Every structure is written in structure tokens, then in C-alpha cells.
Amino acid sequence: MREQVLALREAPFLEEVFGARQGFGHEFQLEPPLSEAEVTAAEEELGVSFPSAYRTFLLEVGAGGAGPHYGIFPLRHDEQGWHWAEGRNVRSDNALLGEAFPSAAERARWEEELNAREPVEPDYPDNQSYLAAFGAWDDEWEQLHASMTAGAICLSHQGCGYFTWLVVTGPERGTLFIDLRAADGTLEPLTAGPNRVGFRDWYLDWLTRAASQARRGSLASWRRGRK
């Protein structure tokens, strides 16, 4: 699979594939694969075992790079230890990775409980005390936002603040979730009909479509070439 992806670097319609554009996207580049010792060390440090399909990807395809949307965030090791190079718009917390991924019902309950505690200005003696209370409440939202993806890896940025997460703990382990919270949406499982979608099918589906588009171009490109 690694060779299939890297071969697309020379495809004639490379820049028509979303997220692959030179200078702005992954350009069908891949990080080197990790060794078994490196993957094991990452799992031990992070306190989780990676789902098998993602683990195989790290070992055989690459630590990150070309993939759906703007690519797969690379898993790297530096003075900070093992972490994903996620970019400036992501705020995932690896300290939460070993915790159970919350259910939809749990996430909804947490939101409802926090909303019910929103400070109301008439309840405070002055504007300063109200703003202090509101600031503390808003900080709780930041914590809740992170808690909602406990037990999941942020894999990919879809653009516009939307992300794809891979669950690594609990009953949903191995399932991908789409994060639509940037537009006041929710975390939703990625599905194909009635079935949850895991890493392997997600990546292979992307590769099939990306290869076709990169090599053949869109209908608009074909029409331009006929003129």
C-alpha cells in the first residue's frame, strides 16, 4: 500500500485530490514506517494498544502523511515523548487517551448538566463577579470539550475545524468518529449503511477514489483537455 500511495506523487491530476495540493496539503507524501519496537514503546507510554488496522498502517505504510482529507497526523517521538503532530487547530489531550470513550448519552448528559449551571448576571452583585463566574464556567466547557474525546486519537483534519477521531478504548474501539463540533454539531460515528467504519476501510476507500482522480482527473479536466 505504501508504494501505491507514493506513486501518486507523479500523477497528472494530483492537485485535484482534496487535501493533496502542493504547498497546502499532504502531496501524497508519507512519513517512514515505525518499527515494532517504536510502536510498542508508544503504546506503553500512552497507556493504550492501537487498533490492529491502525497499528499495521504505522508499521507497514507510514507514521502519518497522505490520507483522507488533509492527511493522517504523524505519530512522532521527541523530547516531549510520543505524540501526534496535529497542527495548531487541534487540542487533543494524550493524558485522556487511556480513559473510556464516552457514549453519546454520557456526552449529552454532560452538556445538559453544564448548560444548566451557566451563570446568569442577575444572580451576581456586580458585573465583575458575574464575569469571573462566567469565565470559570467557560473554562469548564474547554475541559468538557476535551473529555468528550477521551479514549480517542485525532487522526485527520477535514478542514473548517472538522476532525476525524479513532476510538481506542471501550465498546467503540476501532470505530472512526466525525467531529462536527466546530459548527455546533456533535461527534458522530462514521458509518457505511448500518455498519461502523474502521481505519482500514476508511483508508482504502480514500486511496481507491484518490488514485482514480489523481490519474484520470475530473470530468471538467477531461473536457478542458478536449478543447
Put a short name on every predicted segment:
Residues 64-68, 72, 171-173, 182-184, ...:
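Generic alpha-helical propensity signal that fires on short helical segments
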Residues 184-227:
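Long, compositionally biased interface segments
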Residues 74-76, 178, 187-189:
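Short, intrinsically disordered/low-complexity patches at protein termini
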Residues 154, 162-186:
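Low-complexity, glycine/alanine/valine/leucine- and proline-rich hydrophobic stretches
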Residues 11, 78, 93, 175, ...:
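Small/flexible residues
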Residues 82-84, 110, 137, 141, ...:
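A residue-identity detector for tryptophan
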